[in-house]
Amino acid sequence: MTSRYTNTRTESKNSILFATLSSIFGDKMNLARIKFFGLFICALCKVQTVCFEKLAVAFDTDAKVDSSLRRIQRFMAEYMLDNRLIARFVFSLLPHNPPYRLTMDRTNWKFGTSNINILVLAVVYQGVAFPILFKMMPKFGNSSMQERIELMEDFIELFGLQSIDCLLADREFVGDQWLGYLNRRNIRYHIRIKHNFWVNIPRNGHRVKASWLFNSLGIYQYAFHKGIVYVNGQLCYLSASKIKNKQGIPELQIIASFNKPDKAISLYKERWQIESAFKALKTSGFNIEDTHLTDIDRINKLLALVIFAFTWAYIAGVFLDSIRPIKVKKHGRRAKSIFKYGLTYLTSVLFSNDINKFTEICKFLSCT
């Protein structure tokens, strides 16, 4: 009786999940792939690792573990997953309205002699960033100007230029052609530059180091240069603050901006939110670095699935926090992150037989 009851419950839960995913992907993914997708993301939330053997054990199906494992391996090896499907899903669930502040950064790790290097474009939101689009880079080191432009153009094609408020990026993301592209596209940006960059000042013809414009700043002070300047041959505005780096040494944080340099420093601070997302994808969430995959196409599919699960968990956390707010400790920080709050709840529901709660968490996927 218990086994039959459990099987019935499992079938009901899967039916609810598959119906929800079908409403999201429509005719863009066949039913067999939708079923796999659902089983995989649920298993991922349960075991919180990308180890295929552990995921196969957590598949909520009557199939044997070896069969589930082969199913995972076939999906990674053969299926052509369209990243735009995942991007549209994440975009549809964003808990705030456009235009959005975007941030661009890289995440990388090493497995054996293989370097995994991924360029990510994300939407920042209250201490975290939602990865929207990403590009696997077949090399180690910084991204190229062309790779950045392709990622931005993909975003614009999917969601429109009007959905972008500004782009935030670190010192890696500079260069004359890159800034020129952003200027031509009228995309507002706040990008950190190196303090020793040469700056040309049109109003007097002077050529100075960027740091010279702000050498009077004291610790934790900030200022912006009132006139427009040339950096790498491109017109922009500059602002700066003097901060202490990780070693406690004072240094200038100089920001190049399309406009509104008076707001650059406060906006640039939001760039770090993508690091919270990377942490959730890695050690504090799904441990994507545990993968033994080295093939770019397979890692691409795995990352798309992990981003889907991350978004599900975070949206669940937003909902839970709205009805049972996370406690704030004496130092002013939350006792746990919104992401962890949501992931813990999803995991508990997925391990239970509560159909009502399962139906509730499926609604988070369709934003209903």
Stretches found by the model and what they are:
Residues 1-51, 61, 86-87, 97-100, ...:
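Single, function-defining residue in the core of a domain
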Residues 55:
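Short alpha-helical "recognition helix" segments of helix-turn-helix
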Residues 65, 69-126:
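Active-site-proximal, Lys/Arg-enriched surface segment
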